[in-house]
Amino acid sequence: MDNKIIKKVGVILRPSSPQLKSGYEKLEKIFSSYSIEVLIEDKSAKMIGASGASFKKICNECDFLVSFGGDGTLISTVRKSFDYDIPILGIHAGNLGFLADLSLDELDSFVEKITQNRYKIDERAVLEATVIKNEKEIKMYAFNDVVLTRTRVSNMIHIETLVNSRSFNTYYGDGVVVSTPTGSTAYNLSAGGPVLFPMSNVFALTPICPHSLTQRPVVLPGKFTIEMKTSEERALIIIDGQDVHELELGESVHIKLATKTVKLMHKEEYNYFDVLKEKLRWGE
């Protein structure tokens, strides 16, 4: 997007949040003051009583997307826009997020800098999970994480894991989190996994409540592929905490970093470690 003139942006609002109407009106006014047209996605528009455009239309016509809400809204926006390779700006609706790190009060200054080509774009890794069902290949993409877990809360699960087609480990516990660097501060962190720098070319494999103190998180190079399967019962594959798929006995899921990436827009002075310190309250 170097030296590209920004003419049009698409906006997605946090679902079930009609109180964001006034914030959206302020946002639209700011962009319009710099001669930038704003399109709002259909569902968001309906929520606040405005007219909108289809998600496909705004992805095809706009220079970037604006996710207005929180990290969950941004993740949903990322997942819907995977195939369009369009940058996304996250604006939080009150609380600083790991991903939605710009406030509405900062938007005017940010848009002015956009017109001067003064902003930053990070490229973030995405996980690709593949399952073969009825001789059909099903691909799923995760921005944060892929979780393999049990179908019943009262049971533990055995997960056989291979790395680059070689036997690696068998996890016995509540499941396994496979996390991107971006997702390392989400479920992965809660499960005791490491914080990964978001632009690094690696991913993490973290057991959830393992029934052994020797089962520890592992960080793997981005070019590696892991395969996971269960030998005793069905399992659930959960993508970014939003989509759930069943893994039947005899089936396996292959997970690796995808060739596609996600582009996130930030302020010129954005520093990931400043956000990390504030969110995790380090140094307090």
From Swiss-Prot:
Ordered alphabetically, the record's keywords are: ATP-binding, Cytoplasm, Kinase, NAD, NADP, Nucleotide-binding, Transferase
Residues that, per the record, bind NAD(+): 71-72, 144-145, 174, 185-190, 242
Q: Which domain of life is it from?
A: Bacteria
Q: List the disulfide bonds.
A: none
Region forming the signal peptide: none
What family is this?
Belongs to the NAD kinase family.
- Active site as annotated: 71
Presence of keyword Glycosyltransferase:
no
Gene3D superfamilies the record matches: Probable inorganic polyphosphate/atp-NAD kinase, domain 1 (3.40.50.10330), Probable inorganic polyphosphate/atp-NAD kinase, domain 2 (2.60.200.30)
Q: EC number(s)?
A: 2.7.1.23
- Please tell me whether the keyword Transferase is annotated for this protein: yes
Protein name per the record? NAD kinase
Its GO biological process annotations read: NAD metabolic process; NADP biosynthetic process
Which GO molecular function annotations are given, in alphabetical order? Answer: ATP binding; metal ion binding; NAD binding; NAD+ kinase activity
Matching entries from InterPro entries are given as:
ATP-NAD_kinase_N, ATP-NAD_kinase_PpnK-typ_C, NAD/diacylglycerol_kinase_sf, NADK
